[in-house]
Structures are given as structure tokens and as C-alpha cells.
Amino acid sequence: MIKQTVCGLLLGAAITGQAGAAEKLTLVLDWYINPDHAPIMVAEQIGAFKAEGLDVKIVPPSDPALPPRLVAAKQADLAITYQPQLHFFADQGLPLMRVGTLINTPLNTVIALDKSITSPADLKGKTVGYSVSGIEQATLATMVEHEHLKPQDIKLINVNFQLTSALLAGQVDAVIGGYRNIEALELKLQGKTPVVFNVEDYGVPAYDELIIVAHRDAVNEPKIRKFLAALKQGSDYLHAHPQDTWLAFAKARPELNTELNKQAWQ
């Protein structure tokens, strides 16, 4: 995920680490740990968080819709979420602000295995699985309207994290929310030939896939700026040492040492 990874700092200059007890910070990921989180993992690898005086707890979510709401409730300091989703949170009055960028290009797709589905127009009367309420329904609606369908022509069901397994089991005809560098690649490695529709090719404006949000009251806290400074160091090191960082990641997390993650890391 190196080519599409950035760690934009929206809060100004970094604050260097100071002596004393490490300051605790909780980051809730958007999904289970995967190569899209590589800059975070590398910042941890190289000790960048510790150098900034931080003790960072990285938490995969129990529900992919939950992370920003935990930040809004002040149960976590930061969360990874999706740029379009931020507009939904604003409409709901959630006190969230974007503080940084993790992935600055779209990754979202609609994926099918049925070769008769050659465009989103062929989803009429089909069942589509999704994982994150709100944004994925809106994204799919834009895509099918671009193809002159109505959103109600498609049945949607929430499959949570089980995008590929729901597709492989025939529970759904297609899924939205699978990434072109993760779920599409996973299916190929399983010998399948997925039909992949990139969302930006069907009326969805380009956007930043993964962003970092904080509670509105906390955006000026020094630990937020320290985290972003460390993350930038992780991103820079990742770009300079892709193979070394993969090997370190695979060693530290052997359960994630798979061909899928190895290819996606690049």
C-alpha cells in the first residue's frame, strides 16, 4: 500500500518527545490490521511513537461502523475512518474533526464473481453485501444511478467483516466496501476471477479513502500532534524500506504473514 500512502499533518509542526512517563493514546482502526495500516505499524516498529513520548494502543474494532463513535464519546483518542463518512457524522452532530490522512486515493470497489455482471447496471434485482452503514449505501446509490438504476432496485444486507466469505458462499451476488488491494487480491489468490468496479469510475468523486479523526475538543492537544509526527516518520521509513518493514511486520505478527498481506504491503 506504499504508493497510495500519505500521512498528511493538518495540525501544524510536530512537537518533540519530552522526558517523563509516556502519554497514553488510543487509536481505533477502521478494520482488522492489514497493509493499509502499514505507516502506523512501521511507526510502532521503529519506535517513533516512543520517541515522541507516546504509549499508543492500537485497537481493531469489533464493528467497522464503531470507531468514530468511540472518539465522539471520548472513549478513544483517534480513529481511522473514511472521508465521505465524515459528512454523515457532521449531519448527525458528532463532534469529530479530521486531523490527518492515511490513504489519499479511493480503494473502495464493488466486487462480484458472476461474469454476467459486467457493470453496476447488472446489479438490478441482486443482493449486495456491505459492512459500514451510511456511506456504502450512498456510494452504491451514486453508482447505480450513474447507470440509470434506482437504489431500491438492489437489496442490501450487512455482512460486517465477512465481505469475501459472503461472496464466496453465495450469500450475496456482490459486495461493496471491499478494497481493490485487499479483498479483490484475496479472491485472485484463491483462484477466483473477481469482477471489480472502482467506485470513482461510476459517478463517485475522488476522495481520500482513510483519514484520521479526533474529538473536536481534543484537536489541539499536543499528543495528537505528536502522534501525527510519529506517523509521518513511519510513512517515510516505509517508503524508504518496503522490504525490511514487511519482514519486521511479518516477524512481529506471524498470524498476518500471508501471501495476500505480502503483496498488498508493496
What is each of the regions a protein language model found here?
Residues 102-111, 192-217, 228, 263-266:
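Periplasmic-binding protein-like
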Residues 19-21:
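Boundary at the C-terminal end of the N-terminal hydrophobic targeting segment
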Residues 187:
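Extracellular glycan-interaction surfaces
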Residues 126-130, 171-172, 219, 232-238:
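Second-shell loop/turn segments in exported
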Residues 24-160, 164-169, 173-181, 196-197, ...:
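Short, glycine-/small- and polar/acidic-enriched structural segments
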Residues 5-17:
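Bacterial N-terminal signal peptides
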Residues 220-266:
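Secondary-structure end/capping motifs
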Residues 1-2:
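N-terminal secretory signal peptides that target proteins for export/translocation
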